[in-house]
């Protein structure tokens, strides 16, 4: 019985620290130092939440830039179904899937001349990625320009404006947030 008291008091102490103090401290510090990120990096227009800067959305119309394929098949970009998605390179189903995606992209972008960018036919590790390279966005310019009656120059400037450089220049590559880019396209129409 004498050994039970130290074990119980240690349990209660650790329960309070790990179940109360630590979560409250990290929540308070997160809200204080990084309020936008701690609340989901939400993109707002006035009081309306239009999306998150961290999760892609399913833009399908010709007047929008399309992101990477979502791995969450039933409901695209569903964060509750996030997970690994790509088939192994040795799997013949991957070749069929990529060929079907390339054919669909070619049909939707008949004026695009270069080969289809790889990130437009392969899902990301989470299946929720909202970023593509500026080159993948530029590949879609003819379709978007035609659908929105905008010039190639306007869209090129918009892509450049919403391109984000990596924190360290030689680690990573520039990316474009598709959600922010498409919301900016909608603002051009207003």
UniProtKB/Swiss-Prot annotation:
Swiss-Prot/TrEMBL GO biological process terms: monoatomic cation transmembrane transport; potassium ion transmembrane transport; potassium ion transport
Membrane-protein topology: Single-pass membrane protein
InterPro entries: KdpC
Subcellular location: Cell inner membrane
GO cellular component: plasma membrane; potassium ion-transporting ATPase complex; potassium:proton antiporter complex
Domain of life, source organism: Bacteria
Keywords, sorted A to Z: ATP-binding, Cell inner membrane, Cell membrane, Ion transport, Membrane, Nucleotide-binding, Potassium, Potassium transport, Transmembrane, Transmembrane helix, Transport
Induction cue: Transcriptionally regulated by the KdpD/KdpE two-component regulatory system.
Subunit architecture: The system is composed of three essential subunits: KdpA, KdpB and KdpC. The complex also contains KdpF, a small non-essential subunit. The KdpFABC complex exists as a dimer above concentrations of 30-50 nM, whereas the complex exists as a functional monomer at lower concentrations.
Name of the protein in its database record: Potassium-transporting ATPase KdpC subunit
Organism (species): Escherichia coli (strain K12)
Gene: kdpC
């Amino acid at each position: 019985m004498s050994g039970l008291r130290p074990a119980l008091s240690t349990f209660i102490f650790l329960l309070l620290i790990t179940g109360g103090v630590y979560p409250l401290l990290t929540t308070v510090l997160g809200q204080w130092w990084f309020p936008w990120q701690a609340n989901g990096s939400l993109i707002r227009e006035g009081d309306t939440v239009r999306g998150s800067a961290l999760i892609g959305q399913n833009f399908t119309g010709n007047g929008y830039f399309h992101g990477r394929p979502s791995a969450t098949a039933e409901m695209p970009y569903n964060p509750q179904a996030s997970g690994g998605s790509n088939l192994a390179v040795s799997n013949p189903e991957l070749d069929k899937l990529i060929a079907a995606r390339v054919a669909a992209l070619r049909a939707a972008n008949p004026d695009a001349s270069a080969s289809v960018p790889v990130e437009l036919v392969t899902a990301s590790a989470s299946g929720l990625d909202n970023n593509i390279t500026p080159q993948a966005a530029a590949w879609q310019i003819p379709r978007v320009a035609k659908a929105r009656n905008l010039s190639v120059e306007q869209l090129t400037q918009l892509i450049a404006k919403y391109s984000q450089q990596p924190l360290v220049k030689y680690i990573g590559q520039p990316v474009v947030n598709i959600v922010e880019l498409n919301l900016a396209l909608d603002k051009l129409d207003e």
